[in-house]
């Protein structure tokens, strides 16, 4: 049981170190993006999947209501 706890603690600490390194790298990338075009691309990447997901949910319902073939 003790070896299992040691292994889990080791994985936890390695994971937190990995996450902190990734966060620092992401922050460095965000600092480099100063141009408005690159910011707009980031916003488009965030919202396009959201819009596509909503459309995928509502299009069958709208089609069913229009054609009345449910």
From Swiss-Prot:
* Intrachain S-S bonds: 64-70
Coiled coil location: none
| Propeptide cleavage-removed residue intervals | 23-44
The record ties this protein, via Pfam families, to: Antimicrobial_1, FSAP_sig_propep
Q: In which tissues is it expressed?
A: Expressed by the skin glands.
Asked if the keyword Cell membrane belongs to this entry, the reply reads no
Q: What is its main location?
A: secreted
Q: Which UniProt keywords apply?
A: Amphibian defense peptide, Antibiotic, Antimicrobial, Cleavage on pair of basic residues, Disulfide bond, Secreted, Signal
Domain of life of the organism encoding this protein: Eukaryota
Q: Give the record's GO biological process terms.
A: defense response to Gram-negative bacterium; defense response to Gram-positive bacterium
What stretches pass through the bilayer? none
Tell me the leader sequence span.
1-22
Question: Which InterPro entries is this protein grouped with?
Answer: Antimicrobial_frog_1, Frog_antimicrobial_propeptide
Q: Which GO terms describe its cellular component?
A: extracellular region
Give the UniProt subcellular location, in the record's own words: Secreted
According to its UniProt record, which protein family does this protein belong to? Belongs to the frog skin active peptide (FSAP) family. Brevinin subfamily.
Q: What does this protein do?
A: Antimicrobial peptide.
Q: What is this protein called?
A: Brevinin-1Vb
Q: Which organism is it from?
A: Odorrana versabilis
Q: What is the lineage of its organism?
A: Eukaryota, Metazoa, Chordata, Craniata, Vertebrata
């Amino acid at each position: 049981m003790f070896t299992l706890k040691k292994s889990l603690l080791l994985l936890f600490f390695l994971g937190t170190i990995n996450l902190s390194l990734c966060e620092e790298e992401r922050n460095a990338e965000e600092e480099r993006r100063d141009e408005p075009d690159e910011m707009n691309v980031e916003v488009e990447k965030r919202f396009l999947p959201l819009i596509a997901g909503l459309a995928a949910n509502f299009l069958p319902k709208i089609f069913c209501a229009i054609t009345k073939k449910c």
